[in-house]
Structures are given as C-alpha cells and as structure tokens.
Amino acid sequence: MRSIPQFLIAAPTSGSGKTTVSRGLMALFMKKGLKVQPFKCGPDYIDTKYHEAVCGRPSVNLDTFMASQEHVSSLYARYSADADVAVVEGMMGMYDGYDRDRGSSAEVARLLGIPVVLVADAKSAAYSMAPLLSGFINFRPDIRIAGVIFNRCLLYTS
C-alpha cells in the first residue's frame, strides 16, 4: 500500500465533537482537491452517511468487535488505495470498547498503525486539560497521539 496522510479522530469521551471535526476536516481536504476516504470505527451507520455526503464516496465501518482484525485491515487497505488522504472517525471515548479497549478506536489506530488526533472538549476546562491529555499521550506507547484539537473553547474578550 502506498503511503498517504492518514489519521484517526478520537476523543476522551463521547459528545466531544468527533463527528463535527471529522466532517470539517474532510470538507477542507475536499475543497483543496484531495480525494478523501472516510472511515468510521464501530457499527455506526449514521455518521457514515454524513461522511459520504461530504466526500462523495462510501464511508467504511472498521469494526473489530464484529470482524476480524485481518478483515478490518483488508478493508482499510482496499478502500484507501486510491485516496489522497484517509480520515478515520473514532467512536465513544478512545479506549472504550468491550473487555477494556477491545473493539475501541485505540485498537483500530494500533492495528492500522495510524496516528491519532484527539478532540478535547474544552468548554468547561482550561489548564486542567494538560494532565488529561498527558494521560492519553503516555497511557499506551504503542498508540501515537499526533495532535489535539480543542473544541468548544470559550472566547474571552476585554
């Protein structure tokens, strides 16, 4: 498989804005003329329709609970083969799955060897985000956190 820009959008919790951020990034890449291949962790069928509306191509579910890791890897390789960038939207909290992190977004990122961009809901926090993010960055050395997007930041004006 050729090397393309690829990443997984994850968050510490559900409701952090993964879908909004994912769709926004997909739209930005499309506007730049890139062919974007969208993916969604888990069995979700609603978010995949949002992805398809933005990207004009099927969004593929990567579900390590319902399918083998080999099948998930094969789907990812096949559908991203002709893309310029692959964007995988996570589900729930990054490590939330069954039996700890089995079936989680973290498992998919590790399996595919792709970096993670965390979406952190900063609506009711400021400096307290630092230890939270430090925990995510250092919790599993086999999962690379490549960046953080702060969502719902408060704007202070003087």
Predicted feature descriptions by range:
Residues R2-S16, T20, M26-L112, A120-G147:
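ATP-dependent carboxylate-amine ligase catalytic core
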Residues Y156-T157:
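Conserved small/polar residues in nucleotide/adenosyl-binding loops
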